[in-house]
Amino acid sequence: MAVETIQKPETTTKRKIAPRYRVLLHNDDFNPMEYVVMVLMQTVPSLTQPQAVDIMMEAHTNGTGLVITCDIEPAEFYCEQLKSHGLSSSIEPDD
């Protein structure tokens, strides 16, 4: 009796890279600049004061400033935290 060996086809599994999202700070005419910098640093602990100042100035000058690019869950968290402190923020896909 002959034994037949069945070869298992080789499969490669590639992980799909999770999409990234941009957290944006929008300019407003209500909050003092120092307050915006403080909230940015409290919300995103990895930000230094000079980085927070740059983000605030970018929003002040151009209408929006890029706070951070990250996965969807932290992006939603950062956006909601900024909003809870009275700042205007949104998220968008990073292309």
Swiss-Prot record:
SUPFAM superfamilies: ClpS-like. GO terms for biological process: protein catabolic process; proteolysis. Pfam families: ClpS (PF02617). Belongs to the ClpS family. Binds to the N-terminal domain of the chaperone ClpA. This is ATP-dependent Clp protease adapter protein ClpS. It comes from the Bacteria. PANTHER family: ATP-DEPENDENT CLP PROTEASE ADAPTER PROTEIN CLPS (PTHR33473:SF19), ATP-DEPENDENT CLP PROTEASE ADAPTER PROTEIN CLPS1, CHLOROPLASTIC (PTHR33473). Involved in the modulation of the specificity of the ClpAP-mediated ATP-dependent protein degradation.
